[in-house]
Amino acid sequence: MNIIKKLSLLSLIASMLFLVSCDDDSSDPATSGTLNISINLTNPDSWPAEGTVFCSLDKTWPPSGAPYKSVVLQSAQVSNGTISLVFEDLDFDTYALLSVSWLDPNNPNPACNQAVWGTHSGSIQAFYADAVPFTFSAENSELSLVVGAVANTVTPDCPPTG
């Protein structure tokens, strides 16, 4: 009888150790960033019938190529004047600009075929070079930004061709 008690006690202790060792540790450090985005659209009824609207994230500004991350927005996503998005799995890095823009389908010139609807900060007068950069890191892995946007189809003048 003594052996049965010892084996039962040993089995119970082994089971408890197994259960404790399988506990999920939710304090694992983050390995990528998450950006929660709210786009407040002043005039959602002015959504263009043609062209493409983008929400884009750039690491550098002015951009020197394609955005780091970009999604196409649809007018059906607007709810009470707001579009909510989440960009996940972002590199731990510094980002220069979060923007919303409309691409003119009739203008193939990338230097002047987009109308900026809004950015997370910065001004059109400085062509958004004064936007405040933001950084993702293990200590700062989730951010929320708000973009105030005005739907428009006014693109900048194209530079003269030589």
PLM feature spans:
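Short, acidic Ser/Thr/Gly-rich low-complexity loop/linker segments typical of extracellular
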Residues: 64-82
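Short, ordered, surface-exposed loop/turn motifs in non-cytosolic proteins
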Residues: 44-70
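Predominantly extracellular/luminal cell-surface or secreted proteins
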Residues: 40, 54-62, 98-104
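Sec-dependent bacterial lipoprotein signal peptides
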Residues: 1-22
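Short Pro-Gly-centered beta-turn/loop motif in secreted/extracellular proteins
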Residues: 83-96, 100-106
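Bacterial Sec-dependent N-terminal signal peptides
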Residues: 16-42, 158-162
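Structured interaction patches on ligand/partner-binding surfaces of diverse proteins
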Residues: 103-151
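Short, low-complexity, Pro/Ser/Thr/Gly-rich segments in the mature regions of secreted, periplasmic
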Residues: 148-162
